[in-house]
């Protein structure tokens, strides 16, 4: 490589990103990790983290009797698969629930972001009915399931990544792995740009009127 050839650096996932138009700052990954250092509720098998939206673990997902007794209508399994939380439509065939499975591994290298929008849409559709109760589970109810719930709050409840984390931490002890946090951070940047574009379009329309 010639000496004067510029070296392209990879984007730093740990650096904060500031939107110059709104002043909103998407925190760096390290700053997001620090949010989990503070106290959180005692670990339980399942917690309601948003109205009618629950995060739970494998024990919760496997207990069909309790799911039916407590009125759950939708289950999003973020650890679907034979070697994970092996449930599915057939497992729940004796109770009335709608099932959605995501085959995800709790690894920093796993691309969970490919499921952010489909999972968020499933949750949104379920919560459109006031009588629905949604369980989002994985093995421990701390990383995969929590990340999908955070993405839902960001996409459909218009929360920032920090707001969504703080909302869930009020009710449940969660700890998404570092790779998932980076992907949620990227989603935050993307959503901030989309919202700015929507605001710019609205302002332009007002001027045209």
Curated annotation (Swiss-Prot):
Transmembrane segments: none annotated. It is an enzyme of class 3 (hydrolase). Keywords: Cytoplasm, Hydrolase, Nucleus, Protein phosphatase. One of its GO terms (cellular component) is cytoplasm. InterPro entries: Atypical_DUSP_subfamA, Dual-sp_phosphatase_cat-dom, Prot-tyrosine_phosphatase-like, Tyr_Pase_dom, TYR_PHOSPHATASE_DUAL_dom. Its main location: cytoplasm. Residues 44-193 form the Tyrosine-protein phosphatase domain. It is found in: Cytoplasm; Nucleus. It catalyses: O-phospho-L-tyrosyl-[protein] + H2O = L-tyrosyl-[protein] + phosphate; O-phospho-L-seryl-[protein] + H2O = L-seryl-[protein] + phosphate; O-phospho-L-threonyl-[protein] + H2O = L-threonyl-[protein] + phosphate. Dual specificity phosphatase able to dephosphorylate phosphotyrosine, phosphoserine and phosphothreonine residues within the same substrate, with a preference for phosphotyrosine as a substrate. Involved in the modulation of AMPK and MAPK1/2 signaling pathways. PROSITE patterns: TYR_PHOSPHATASE_2, TYR_PHOSPHATASE_DUAL. This is Dual specificity phosphatase 29. One of its GO terms (biological process) is protein dephosphorylation. Substrate binds at residues 137-144. Belongs to the protein-tyrosine phosphatase family. Non-receptor class dual specificity subfamily. Pfam families: DSPc. It comes from the Eukaryota. The active site is at residue 138. GO terms for molecular function: protein serine/threonine phosphatase activity; protein tyrosine phosphatase activity; protein tyrosine/serine/threonine phosphatase activity. Its EC number is 3.1.3.16, 3.1.3.48. SUPFAM superfamilies: (Phosphotyrosine protein) phosphatases II. The keyword Nucleus applies.
């Amino acid at each position: 490589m010639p000496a004067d050839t510029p070296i392209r650096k990879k984007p730093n996932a740990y650096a904060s990103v500031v939107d110059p138009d709104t002043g909103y700052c998407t925190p760096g990954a390290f700053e997001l990790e620090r949010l989990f250092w503070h106290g959180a509720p005692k670990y339980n098998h399942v917690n309601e983290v948003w109205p009618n939206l629950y995060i739970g673990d494998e024990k919760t997902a496997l207990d069909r009797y309790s799911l039916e007794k407590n009125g759950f209508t939708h289950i999003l399994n973020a650890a679907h698969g034979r070697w994970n939380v092996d449930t599915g439509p057939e497992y729940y065939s004796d109770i009335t629930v709608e099932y959605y499975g995501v085959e995800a591994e709790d690894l920093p290298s796993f691309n969970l972001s490919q499921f952010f929008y489909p999972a968020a849409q499933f949750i949104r559709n379920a919560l459109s009915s006031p009588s629905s109760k949604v369980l989002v589970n994985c093995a421990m109810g701390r990383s995969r399931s929590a990340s999908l719930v955070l993405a839902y709050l960001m996409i459909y409840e218009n929360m920032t990544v920090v707001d969504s984390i703080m909302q869930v931490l009020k009710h449940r002890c969660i700890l998404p792995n570092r790779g998932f946090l980076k992907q949620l951070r990227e989603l935050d940047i993307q959503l901030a740009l989309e919202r700015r574009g929507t605001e710019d379009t609205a302002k332009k329309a007002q001027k045209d009127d």
